[in-house]
Amino acid sequence: GLKDIFKAGLGSLVKGIAAHVAN
């Protein structure tokens, strides 16, 4: 459902930020 899509998008965003900060 929409919640699953939102969670997946949010998780991806967090991973992207974490990767950016790690670099």
Swiss-Prot record:
The modification Asparagine amide is found at residue 23. It comes from the Eukaryota. GO terms for cellular component: extracellular region; membrane; other organism cell membrane. This is Alyteserin-1a. Coiled coil: none annotated. The keyword Membrane applies. Antibacterial peptide with amphipathic alpha-helical structure. Shows selective growth inhibitory activity against the Gram-negative bacteria E.coli (MIC=25 uM) Has a weak hemolytic activity against human erythrocytes (LC(50)>100 uM). Is very weakly active against S.aureus (MIC=200 uM). The lineage of its organism: Eukaryota, Metazoa, Chordata, Craniata, Vertebrata. It comes from Alytes obstetricans. It is found in: Secreted; Target cell membrane. The keyword Secreted applies. Keywords: Amidation, Amphibian defense peptide, Antibiotic, Antimicrobial, Immunity, Innate immunity, Membrane, Secreted, Target cell membrane, Target membrane. Expressed by the skin glands. Belongs to the frog skin active peptide (FSAP) family. Alyteserin-1 subfamily. GO terms for biological process: defense response to bacterium; innate immune response.
